[in-house]
Amino acid sequence: MAQKKGGGSTRNGRDSQPKMLGVKKFGGEVINAGSIIVRQRGTQFHPGVNVGIGKDHTLYALVDGQVSFAIKGSMNKRTVNVTAA
């Protein structure tokens, strides 16, 4: 007979890497073209004037300028704009 009980195993021990999502540049900040404004899953924020969208829904500036956020339309979509400097 065994003198000690078996140690057993655990089903824990896994965790995914952080994805660093969220707003990176806030309203009023001055940014350069190509700067990431928002990293997101899906379109919580929609691209507005002078803002591009990547295949992972990242919003980025197309021109140098100042960031502004707005709520538009009957569906209250949150949009991000960059006014050229």
From Swiss-Prot:
Protein name listed in UniProt: Large ribosomal subunit protein bL27
Compositionally biased intervals (Gly residues): 1-10
Species assigned in the record: Polaromonas naphthalenivorans (strain CJ2)
A single GO cellular-component term on record: cytosolic large ribosomal subunit
Region (Disordered) location: 1-21
GO molecular function: structural constituent of ribosome
Keywords for the protein's UniProt record, in alphabetical order: Ribonucleoprotein, Ribosomal protein
GO biological process, one term: translation
Family: Belongs to the bacterial ribosomal protein bL27 family.
A Pfam family matched in the record: Ribosomal_L27
NCBIfam families assigned: L27
